[in-house]
Amino acid sequence: MIMKHKHSGTKTFLRFSAILSIAAILFISAGCKLIENLHPELVQRGEEFPGSKECSKCHIDIYNEWVESSHSNSYTNEAFKVSTNNYEFKFCLGCHVPETIFKSQSGNPADKSGVGLSTLKDEEIAARSYKLADGVDCQGCHLTADCTLAGPHSGVSPHPTEKREKLYKTSALCGICHRDTMEEYLAYTEGGGEATCQECHMPAVNRKLIQNEPWQKLHARKEGKAHTF
């Protein structure tokens, strides 16, 4: 009889532990979902999307790199101004001030897997009509058509995120706009080259994705990319 009571007690403990584990998982999942919806204004404000200045409040290091890059002045630099006859030619704007590379001018989202992005022509990318001085900003490369911020990593964030590691680690992403360079790159790979655009133009850096409190406490250091382009 004593052995039966011991066995019964063990089964009860295991059931209780399983219930606690499931409850903890559900609690954490619900908590993460609540956190993701904490600041919806970080991904959309009416008809406009927030600019890179909003991103700088948390992604301090990345913003400071981007603001000194050629992507940040893709609209304001003198060469672009002259070549477009003082911004008269509008067909270039999709790549120089993109609303997001994940949406075409027709409003249709690009292939969510990222595969179809390489066939999206630069003149088909929807250009934005606001915050032009930001050039190719954060949202241009990271904001999806359904207002989720995509990137190569996942993590707890006050806005919706989506991990698309394959897309952000391949040269096809850069080839959406850098079409002439992409042709040179394809010739390079046909000759046996293996390095991606990111490996050369976005050096690896080990750091936390976020530098602001309290969010940085929720992130471990990991290998990311410098946004100096």
Question: What are these language model-derived features?
Answer:
Residues 1-12:
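N-terminal secretory signal peptides that target proteins for export/translocation
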Residues 15-21:
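Sec-dependent signal peptide recognition
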Residues 22-27:
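Hydrophobic core
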Residues 29-31:
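C-terminal motif of bacterial Sec signal peptides marking the signal peptidase cleavage site
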Residues 34-46, 63-83, 87, 101-229:
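Primarily the internal scaffold of c-type cytochrome electron-transfer domains
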Residues 41-58:
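Post-signal peptide N-terminal segment of mature Sec-exported envelope proteins
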Residues 92-93:
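Signature of short aromatic-glycine-proline-rich micro-motifs recurring in repeat-based ectodomains
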